[in-house]
Amino acid sequence: MSWQSYVDDSLVGSGFMHSAAIVGLADGSYWAYGGTYVPQPEEVTHILKCLENFSLVQSSGVTICGVKFFGLQSGSEGQMKYIFFKKGAAGGCIYTSKQTAIIAVYGNPGDASALQQDLQKTEATYVAVNPADCNTTVKRIAEYLISLDY
């Protein structure tokens, strides 16, 4: 399976997130990505710093595609590190494997625009997602990659 297939089929394709990226822990390079909210290179650099120093998550949050999320929780579990973040009804998570960080976003971080769409009688483009479904899906991919020494 290609790295892009992990994003297209297993992450975004799960329906539990609308955007995802897999980046290298060593250098922040993009291995694969898809969706609307993909972190920009300087945002990936900050995310990697947050994974090394969890206090940054609480003090500065996480920014993805220019949207600032506040950090809910961060820590380590076995060989994985994780960060959970939120903004309004939107949010996401980051899990690491041995060589990658998997970044996922669900919901619409611009809640006001979703409300505006509703007022204009147009359909909102993001479906409500249970955050636990997003987190569990990303965690399982990270665990699988760890089992393959990635």
Swiss-Prot record:
**Keyword Cytoplasm, does the record have it?**
yes
Family of this protein: Belongs to the profilin family.
Which InterPro entries does UniProt cross-reference here? PFN, PFN_euk, PFN_sf, Profilin_CS
Subunit structure, interactors included: Occurs in many kinds of cells as a complex with monomeric actin in a 1:1 ratio.
Ordered alphabetically, the record's keywords are: Actin-binding, Cytoplasm, Cytoskeleton
Q: Name one GO molecular function term.
A: actin monomer binding
CDD domains, per database record: PROF (cd00148)
From what organism does this protein derive?
A: Trypanosoma brucei brucei
Name-wise, this protein is: Profilin
Q: Major location, coarse class?
A: cytoplasm
Q: Where in the cell is it found?
A: Cytoplasm, Cytoskeleton
Q: What does this protein do?
A: Binds to actin and affects the structure of the cytoskeleton. At high concentrations, profilin prevents the polymerization of actin, whereas it enhances it at low concentrations. By binding to PIP2, it inhibits the formation of IP3 and DG.
